[in-house]
Curated annotation (Swiss-Prot):
Gene Ontology terms, MF aspect: 3-dehydroquinate dehydratase activity
Native organism: Pelobacter propionicus (strain DSM 2379 / NBRC 103807 / OttBd1)
Binding site for substrate: N75, H81, D88, M102, S103, R112
Protein name (Swiss-Prot/TrEMBL): 3-dehydroquinate dehydratase
HAMAP family registered for this protein in UniProt: AroQ (MF_00169)
Amino acid sequence: MKKILVLNGINLNMFGKRDPAHYGTATLEQIDARVAAWGAELGLQIDCFQTNHEGEMVERIHRAHEEGVDALIINAGAWTHYSYGIADALAILKAPVIEVHMSNIHAREEFRHHSVIAGLARGQICGFGVGSYHLALLAASELLNAGQE
């Protein structure tokens, strides 16, 4: 069974409480449960992780490299726009990386338009709410089933 690591970054533990116009009302726990269910339907093993500490995120990405995860889906939150440490950690991975966001970062404030992760990712999915995670899982499954990295 292919293993997918789903990473959620800074402030994303506040889903369901923070700015429902952009992020909806689902909590991170509800999102993680949906991701696990969607993964099971696709025959994928899902591991979800969230932290508000950049160093912890980098260390989890390093462990993903050591564990040999098959793909990584990341919603880095605000780190998307400035964390070169997270970007450098992602660059170490051999597995495909898919960047995901619940809101359309390109239709929001100017500072959100730039991603330091996008250039390292196979693709970026944004603007579909919780469905962005589902689309990312479908993309990961397609990549892995096609034998692409």
